[in-house]
């Protein structure tokens, strides 16, 4: 671990401002950006981690707000449809060894300890393949953080469709994610010096 990674940082707790704390760790949503191909989003994330810009205000993004508004419904629908119970809702966790890796879990599936991720997608851009591809970095990151072997992606679409997608941990892909995240965080911390 580098000196930059080992530096003392605020702890995640319920009373802390999560927007401020997000600067000090890489989360699942960050993994999706880091492993994606949206260069402006990647540059913005890098600048956020450096403290140059505030996290983007998504309160005016209707699709994001629909996702937030349907998370509880999504979880209840998943539980009713599968008979499974989701625990650890909105639990903030850190990787036990790589303290710069964190996750805010939508939940864990009781009994299997699978990571549960609830998403809302617009019907005209939805396919199971597209959903799995879009959210795979986030699922793999979150599975790595909590040492889970599986994840469940529960998707509600604006067209009234619900889909469950099961993902298995992919150690090779997780290694690539950790490497890319580490490089992103190191560059944000060290270039400032």
Q: What does each model-identified segment do?
A:
Residues 192-193:
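Long, amphipathic alpha-helical segments that form or neighbor coiled-coils/leucine zippers used
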Residues 1-69, 73:
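Charged, glycine-rich intrinsically disordered N-terminal tails and low-complexity linkers that flank
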Residues 74, 78:
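A carbohydrate-recognition surface predominantly in extracellular/luminal proteins
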Residues 64, 80-188:
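Nucleic-acid nuclease catalytic cores
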């Amino acid at each position: 671990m580098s000196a930059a990674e080992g530096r003392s940082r605020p702890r995640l707790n319920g009373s802390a401002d999560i927007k401020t704390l997000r600067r000090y760790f890489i989360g699942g949503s960050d993994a999706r950006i880091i492993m994606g191909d949206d260069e402006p989003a990647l540059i913005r994330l890098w600048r956020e981690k450096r403290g140059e810009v505030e996290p983007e205000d998504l309160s005016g993004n209707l699709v994001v707000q629909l996702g937030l508004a349907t998370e509880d419904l999504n979880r209840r629908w998943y539980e009713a449809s599968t008979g499974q119970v989701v625990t650890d809702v909105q639990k903030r966790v850190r990787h036990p060894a790589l303290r710069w890796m964190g996750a805010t879990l939508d939940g864990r599936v009781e009994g299997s300890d699978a990571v549960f991720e609830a998403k809302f997608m617009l019907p005209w851009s939805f396919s199971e393949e597209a959903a799995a591809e879009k959210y795979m970095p986030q699922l793999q990151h979150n599975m790595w953080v909590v040492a889970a072997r599986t994840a469940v992606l529960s998707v509600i679409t604006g067209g009234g469709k619900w889909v469950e997608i099961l993902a298995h941990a992919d150690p090779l892909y997780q290694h690539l994610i950790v490497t890319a995240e580490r490089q992103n965080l190191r560059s944000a911390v060290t270039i400032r010096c």
